[in-house]
Swiss-Prot record:
Organism: Methanosarcina acetivorans (strain ATCC 35395 / DSM 2834 / JCM 12185 / C2A)
Name listed for the protein in its UniProt record: Large ribosomal subunit protein uL11
GO molecular function annotation: large ribosomal subunit rRNA binding; structural constituent of ribosome
Stored NCBIfam families: PRK01143.1
Xref: Pfam families: Ribosomal_L11, Ribosomal_L11_N
Matches recorded under PANTHER family: 60S RIBOSOMAL PROTEIN L12 (PTHR11661), LARGE RIBOSOMAL SUBUNIT PROTEIN UL11M (PTHR11661:SF1)
Family indicated by similarity: Belongs to the universal ribosomal protein uL11 family.
Length: 161
């Protein structure tokens, strides 16, 4: 029987404590070894929470799947901030360029429901709203409308999905 443990861990800094240790202990695997593999695979996401899936088969073989961090974490990393606004309607904590939005959308390509770059960018902008993050100096909702109207088509002409 295969067991699956899913957890959100700090990139490159997972440890044998909760949530991994208590979940992996009963499965009889070498927790230290699993944690080292997770840290190796998540090193590029340092400072962000990263979803990981540890799959243990009945022969104690371990497979680790690493997801992408939540969109909010990627946006905060792009802006170099620690947290979003506590008062998103009136407090702005940062401003993304349209290229940064496209970059985050491409990073989330495997996780988003969108079939093209523009739609994925609108999903990213939707995550910016409750964080108090503007895009190109506009409220994220207004920037979504501008994107629909083709305002950024010339900037996105060379952007690949």
């Amino acid at each position: 029987m295969t067991s699956i443990v899913e957890a959100l861990v700090p990139g490159g800094k997972a440890n044998p404590g909760p949530p991994l240790g208590p979940a992996l202990g009963p499965l009889g695997v070498n927790i230290k070894e699993v944690v080292e593999k997770i840290n190796e695979k998540t090193r590029d996401y340092n400072g962000m929470q990263v979803p990981v899936k540890v799959i243990v088969d009945d022969k104690k073989n371990v497979e680790i799947e690493v997801g992408t961090p939540p969109t909010a974490s990627l946006v905060m990393k792009e802006l170099g901030i620690q947290k979003g606004s506590g008062n998103a309607g009136s407090e702005v904590v940062g401003n993304l360029t349209i290229s940064q939005v496209a970059k985050v959308a491409r990073m989330k390509k495997e996780d988003v429901l969108s079939y093209d770059l523009k739609a994925a960018m609108k999903e990213v902008m939707g995550s910016c709203v409750p964080m108090g993050v503007n895009v190109e100096g506009m409220k994220a909702k207004d920037c979504q409308k501008a994107l629909d109207e083709g305002k950024f088509d010339d900037l996105l002409a060379g952007e690949a999905w």
